[in-house]
Amino acid sequence: MRDRFLRACRRQPVDRTPIWLMRQAGRYMPEYRAVRERYGFLQMVKTPEIAAEVTLQPIAAFGVDAAIIFADILPPLEGLGLRLTYEKGEGPVIHNPIRHPHDVATLHPCDPRETVAYTLDAVRLVKRELNGLPLIGFSGAPFTLASYAIEGGGSKEYRLTKRFMYEQPTAWHDLMERLGTLVAEYLIAQVEAGADAVQIFDSWAGTLAPADYRAYVLRHTQNVVATVRARLGAAAPPIIYFGTDMAGLAGELRQLGTDVLGVDWRIDLDVAWAQYGYEHAVQGNLDPMTLFAPPELIASRAREILQRAGGRPGHIFNLGHGILTETPVEHVRYLVEFVQSYPLPTTTPALQEVMQ
């Protein structure tokens, strides 16, 4: 059953819980490091053959239930006219950040089919090698992309972002609409290239108060989801939304219209699922640091998550964030094998609800 992941996204019964891991292709893998020694990060992202090779590495190494295209959320911003580099020890840097309404007005219209064509080519290459295993495309969410564009890189407090949001609300919503259009078109293009599902990463939205999320973010993310569904119709894929520190936004996340909501490790899975509503599938939620623990503790924590899911159709096992750089490879393999061998309950009230 190679479609376990897609079936779980749609809350359909599966024979076991599917598992894939955010940042499953990364520096913790010696195969990845061997490639990284020869190429810069952006060169890897922008060379379809290399991106495809790296995407496939964890499939060969661990047999996870889905691949996620090797890419990054920020390169699509280059099509708008933002200058992006990745600096050693500093991470992504945008050299002409958005600080004034004029900066928003002068952003270039762009078509990601042209400006991020390398990722779409990588999707096509990977799709040919997966033999029916699902491929996940992704994008940053409008808010997270706006935060990077305004801050000029990462941030801990997002002071510039929030000040722009509060002090320039008209320009803020203009920026979010432009980014929403970019995100929707990028996701649609990935599906057209062969992606079977898409994930929207809203890495920094957990910094917002619920009132601010409702006022400045919610409708723009809703529009992305609605646009993807409307444009693709019956071909629309499962849509996943993920952010960290989102437990206080459960009421807002229920309104996004996505199929799957990601859960980080700061809330128990069953509590989050009840808050999000059982009309959603959920994805998560092992603390990435747990993979540094002894195998018996990894098993204990994974078992608890699976028990909290209770066999209800619609659980995709994942971490609550990306795999960390120095994670032991053998612990990743142990986790995948443990989850894939864990027996689902043969009868549960949740399963009976779906099958009736």
Curated annotation (Swiss-Prot):
Belongs to the uroporphyrinogen decarboxylase family. It is an enzyme of class 4 (lyase). Pathway: Porphyrin-containing compound metabolism; protoporphyrin-IX biosynthesis; coproporphyrinogen-III from 5-aminolevulinate: step 4/4. The keyword Cytoplasm applies. It is found in: Cytoplasm. Its EC number is 4.1.1.37. This is Uroporphyrinogen decarboxylase. It catalyses: uroporphyrinogen III + 4 H(+) = coproporphyrinogen III + 4 CO2. SUPFAM superfamilies: UROD/MetE-like (SSF51726). Keywords: Cytoplasm, Decarboxylase, Lyase, Porphyrin biosynthesis. The record marks D72 as: Transition state stabilizer. One of its GO terms (molecular function) is uroporphyrinogen decarboxylase activity. Substrate binds at R23, Q24, A25, G26, R27, D72, Y148, S203, H321. GO terms for cellular component: cytosol. GO terms for biological process: protoporphyrinogen IX biosynthetic process. The keyword Plastid does not apply. Catalyzes the decarboxylation of four acetate groups of uroporphyrinogen-III to yield coproporphyrinogen-III. Its main location: cytoplasm. InterPro entries: UROD/MetE-like_sf (IPR038071), Uroporphyrinogen_deCO2ase_HemE (IPR006361), Uroporphyrinogen_deCOase (IPR000257). Homodimer. It comes from Chloroflexus aggregans (strain MD-66 / DSM 9485). It comes from the Bacteria. It holds the Pfam family URO-D.
